[in-house]
From Swiss-Prot:
Disulphides: none
Record's protein name: Large ribosomal subunit protein bL12
One biological process term in Gene Ontology: translation
GO MF, one annotated term: structural constituent of ribosome
Family to which the UniProt record says this protein belongs: Belongs to the bacterial ribosomal protein bL12 family.
Pfam families attached to this UniProt entry: Ribosomal_L12, Ribosomal_L12_N
Subunit organization: Homodimer. Part of the ribosomal stalk of the 50S ribosomal subunit. Forms a multimeric L10(L12)X complex, where L10 forms an elongated spine to which 2 to 4 L12 dimers bind in a sequential fashion. Binds GTP-bound translation factors.
Keyword terms: Ribonucleoprotein, Ribosomal protein
Record's GO cellular component terms: cytosolic large ribosomal subunit
Keyword Ribonucleoprotein: yes
C-alpha cells in the first residue's frame, strides 16, 4: 500500500507538461488513445438530455501550433510565459501543437496569444 501512496504523491507533483508527456508515453506503451476514450464517452453523457445549445466558455487553452520559422524567439517567449528551462521549452516548441497554458481566462489567453504571435509563433485558443 505504501508503494501506491508514493505513486500517487509522485504523480501529484508532476507539472501539466510532465503529465501530458506521461500520458503520451503510456498511450504508446499500452497501444491506446485517451482522446478516443473521451470522444466516445462524451456523447453518451448528455446526448439528447436537453443540454444548453451554446455554452459560455470561461477557460481557454493556449495551443502553440507552430514556430513560424522563428524557433529561437518562440522558445524565449515560451520560457518567459511558462517558466520552463531551455530544454523543456525547446521540446515543447518542437513538438507543436502543444498547450502552452491551460485553463486560463479569456483576457490572459488573448494576451498570451498576442505575445507568442509577436515572437513569430502560430497560436490558437481552445
Amino acid at each position: 500500500m505504501a508503494d501506491l501512496q508514493k505513486l500517487v504523491d509522485d504523480l501529484s507533483a508532476l507539472t501539466v507538461l510532465e503529465a501530458a508527456e506521461l500520458s503520451k508515453l503510456l498511450e504508446e506503451k499500452w497501444g491506446v488513445s485517451a482522446a478516443a476514450a473521451v470522444a466516445v464517452a462524451a456523447p453518451a453523457g448528455g446526448a439528447g438530455a436537453g443540454a444548453p445549445a451554446a455554452e459560455v466558455k470561461d477557460e481557454f487553452d493556449v495551443i502553440l501550433t507552430g514556430d513560424g520559422g522563428k524557433k529561437i524567439n518562440v522558445i524565449k517567449e515560451v520560457r518567459a510565459i511558462t517558466g520552463l528551462g531551455l530544454t523543456e521549452a525547446k521540446t515543447l516548441v518542437e513538438s507543436a501543437p502543444k498547450a502552452v497554458k491551460e485553463g486560463v481566462n479569456k483576457d490572459e489567453a488573448e494576451k498570451l496569444k498576442k505575445q507568442l504571435e509577436e515572437a513569430g509563433a502560430t497560436v490558437e485558443l481552445k
